[in-house]
Structures are given as structure tokens and as C-alpha cells.
Amino acid sequence: SVVPLIPADFPYPVVLVQHMPKGFTGSLAARLNELSPLRVKEACDGEPLRPGTLYIAMGGKQCQLIQKRPGEYYISEKDAEARGGLKPCADIFYESLVNTSLDKIYSIVLTGMGSDATKGIQLLKQTKKVEVVAQDRESCVVYGMPRAAALAGIVDEMVPLTEITKTMLKRIGV
């Protein structure tokens, strides 16, 4: 409902942090790559980010974004500790964006237990322009993560799952 609707000519890289254990994100990436016009792959440590590619954070590792030079961003996948029992953890990924020169960041918060993503986005919003679209309560299997983000006041728009991609593409101007 989200990834397959992103067009093949999408001009930016996309990073998906999905709470999945080691060994499952590779098959998820392969399946989404079959269903999507966008290139989808499991993120690899040291890999440069490329426009038109969606990188799925590797299960069982912590994913961060590293900037080597202005405009050059790389994935870092490390065997760091779990945070809140999560590996990968969206908060850790968002926190890594603070130290980059990215000036505008778009985020989607989908169904999930707990409050992962909220603290990271709050921190990011202190120094960057961040737009957040979250899945609405009615279309969530578990309303935890979108609810936490909404209660923290960091969500710009809440929409049904079927409208997430269209809404974000409109916000980005694609």
C-alpha cells in the first residue's frame, strides 16, 4: 500500500526502518522490489545512498546515515545494542540525521507498537525542517507509533494507509 506506489523516477533515496529480526529484511526487500517500480534493497554497511532506491534497514542491526562530504551519504549498519528492544530502531536512525547537512527531511510513521520514531523526530525537528505524515488510527493494526508521534505534536498530517504515498508525494512536490 505504500512502497509499490512510489514512482520509479523518484528523485531521492528512501530509508525504511522496519522492526524485523535478522534474516527477514532481505526477503522483504526482494519481495517489495518485485512489486515496486522503485528499486528496493536491503541496506548494506558502507553503501552510498542513491536517488530512486529504497533501502530497508537490516534486521538485527542499528542503521544510521553517515555523511562523508556535502551531498554524500552512506548507510552504516552496526551490531550496536538494541534500544527499547529494537534492532533496528527508528530513533537511532533519526538521531543520525542531526549530524548531516540535510536541510529537509520527510518522514512516514506507520502502524507499530510503542513510541519508536517519536524521540528521534523530536530531536531532528530542533535543527531541521521535517515533515511527518502518520497512519491514522482506523487503518492501523497497532496504533502505538502513530499515536505517540501525534501526542508529541510532531505529525503534520494523519491519513489512511491507502493515502500515505499520495500524501507524501504531494508534500515533496513529486
What positions do the PLM features span?
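Conserved acid/base catalytic micro-environments in cytosolic active-site loops
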Residues: 1-174
